[in-house]
Amino acid sequence: MGYTSGVGREAPTFVASAVDGSEINLKQYRGDWFAVLVFLPTQAASAETALAQLSGAADNLWGMRGQLLGICDASREECTTLAGKVADLAFPLLPDDGTIAQAYGALKPNGEVRAMTFIVDRAGKIVWMSEGDAALKPATLMTAFREVAR
């Protein structure tokens, strides 16, 4: 699967199992919900902090018909351990073997994941994306979400 994402393009679909056992199909959000995909490099020292901060934003997104999905570049066991370090994680955390990250252009040539966030609208189109530290900042995400969800 090659890099197929970008603002204005159809979001690559996927089905994945979250660490809580729920099955997530990106298509389930079409029609009523915006999906907010956050690619999180779990080896980064700030991964736990980013998850905790994003968890607070997830509740706000939910109230505006947005579902945050965390996508981790780690095994199920590693993702479960990371999720366990964040009290009351408010969004699904999905382990990824690189397949989803590659489809969204979040996979570096060395196999590591870039910190990236994508907002997918109700029609399944990517309407916003960010890369780097700003991609994991709740304030940046909430500002962008309010803008595109009008």
Model-derived segments and their meaning:
Residues 112-150:
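Thiol-/selenol-based redox modules, centered on thioredoxin-like
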Residues 1-27, 49, 53, 143-146:
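N-terminal "domain-start" segment that seeds a small globular fold
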Residues 69, 80-114:
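Short, internal strand/loop/helix patches
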